[in-house]
Design a protein with these regions (language model features):
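Sec-dependent N-terminal signal peptides
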Residues: 6-10
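Generic beta-sheet signal
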Residues: 26, 110-118
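Positively charged n-region of N-terminal signal peptides that target proteins for export
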Residues: 1-4
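C-terminal motif of bacterial Sec signal peptides marking the signal peptidase cleavage site
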Residues: 14-17
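Active-site-proximal alpha-helix that buttresses catalytic centers in soluble enzyme cores
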Residues: 20-107, 123-126, 133-165
Length: 165
């Protein structure tokens, strides 16, 4: 009888683990407002409004259990990610916007909750690559408030956009 009980417990546990689907959630934002006084500067810092928005993003993510924070290697994306990363005691991991959502990235982030800070022309593209469809167009150059949330549960992918004003 003891053997059958253990066998039944093993089978039940195995079946339960097979039906449990990992959830992966990506939060994708564009960097906050940047200094625009020097149009030749390809790597500007955040302006005062941008610094405030970056702080607000940190507040937004306060109660969300992030596992990782990614940003491109630009001042404005690093500065946008910084308050959230500091609040979560996480390093900011750099990613190449020309190599978005690779197999390696998908594997490393599977089952995790991740913040990705990019640009107006990379954030929607990144979301589209995760989704495997062309759902979103490039963002307006003045849109620093959109938050793309992409969730993967098993093979099901969903997404939505929220606005943080």
């Amino acid at each position: 009888m003891k053997k059958y009980t253990l066998l039944l417990l093993f089978v039940f546990t195995t079946l339960l683990s097979c039906t449990t689907k990992e959830t992966t959630t990506y939060y994708l934002i564009r960097h906050a407002e940047k200094v625009r006084t020097d149009v030749t500067n390809r790597n500007p810092n955040l302006n005062e409004a941008g610094k405030e928005r970056a702080t607000n993003w940190g507040t937004y993510f306060k109660n969300i259990d992030l596992d990782a924070v990614y940003a491109t290697d630009y001042n404005r994306t690093q500065q946008t990610a910084s308050p959230t990363a500091k609040n979560k005691n996480l390093p900011i991991q750099k990613y190449d916007p020309r190599k978005m959502y690779t197999e390696d990235f998908a594997a490393v982030t599977k089952g995790k909750t991740v913040l990705i800070v990019g640009h107006s022309n990379t954030t929607p593209v990144f979301a589209n690559k995760i989704l495997g469809e062309q759902k979103y167009k490039n963002m307006d150059d003045r849109d620093n408030a959109s938050l793309y949330i992409v969730t993967i549960v098993g093979t099901e992918k969903t997404s939505r956009i929220e606005i943080l004003e």
